[in-house]
Amino acid sequence: MIRVGYMGIPFSNSAEMSERLAKAIGLEECEHVALMSAVGVVSALMDGSIDYGVLAVCNRFAGPVMETREALEGKPIESIRMEWTHIHHCVFLKHKDAKVTKLVSHIQALLQSKDNLHRLYPNAEFSECEDTAYAAEMLADGTLSDDCAAVCRRDAGEHYRLYLAHENVEDNKENMTQFSIIRRV
């Protein structure tokens, strides 16, 4: 079976785009493999453990995804198809009454929502993690303390049964990210 790796974990934007881009190039029957990072995707392509990879390339407002750019540098990889998708972020808490001192997410989500997050949580610090959905998972399983909030997709927070504090916190309602499906040349 054809394997398509993506950065992130289930309930991330990359997971959705992995399915969408695979279908767009005619891969109806394939296994989608969560690989957390762009480096993980590129390494798996290079060692042959996946056939295709899906990476976030650029955000309309936050700019290039540097993690992807650095992972691809000098590698014999080609892009097969690129697509833009709207990106929305929510703030989820462990409990309704949580006092937020730290906002945790992928750097791109924090950058795409920084003005609204500063307005909503003026004293909270930003803390980067590998993936938006991973922030929700870590908050739910207790890896993150109750004073943390996860900035992630709505379905990620709901999957982990977190409390939805704010929806659509991205600074620009036309927030979009370009994703690419790639393969080794």
Where do the language-model regions lie?
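Domain-level signature for soluble enzymes in the chorismate/prephenate branch of the shikimate pathway
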Residues: 1-185
